[in-house]
Amino acid sequence: MKLTKKSIALGCCLALILCFCAAPLFAEAEPKVGQVLGPVKFAKPLTDEDAKYLGLPKAQEFTIQDVKSPYILIEQFNNMCPHCMHQAPGLNELFNLVQQDPALKDKLKFMSVGQNNDEMQVKAWKVIQKVPFAVIPDPTASLGKALNFSPYPVTMLVDKSGKILWDVGIIFF
């Protein structure tokens, strides 16, 4: 059986189409409203100031339930992600607006979690992006594993139980 260039090209095209059609079957599902985070143990906040902001007695490992606020806005980022870099100023502005509102200030805490980022990387992120709220290293991607979702940035509002109340998902600019 002699294969022609035309049949080889057609076979390659069909193989590519099958690959692209199969990819969504293996894709991770974005976090959904109502989903509850598993038992995530976060690394210690960068500074004692960040720990104090979250209501922790000191900079130590913690869970969502340890945060002294009924609601937490969590951003999952990576310091090399251009979309995360683009999103950072908007989150900083939102944080400042919440801090100026006496009704919200103590009811909503902000937390950025650096997926696959160590302490040095998130320190640089906090300085370069001028992040005024708590930044947490997550070198083992524990939040992404709890969500079963690794892309970033993801921004979500959770309650004390870890239930997702609102999810922006992935923001593409």
Label each region the model flagged:
Residues 160-173:
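Non-catalytic, surface beta->alpha helical segment in thiol-disulfide oxidoreductase systems
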Residues 26-63:
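N-terminal "domain-start" segment that seeds a small globular fold
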Residues 111, 123-160:
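Short, internal strand/loop/helix patches
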Residues 85-129, 142-144:
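Structural microenvironment flanking redox-active thiols in thiol-disulfide oxidoreductases
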Residues 11-21:
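Bacterial N-terminal signal peptides
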Residues 2-12:
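Bacterial N-terminal signal peptides that target proteins for export
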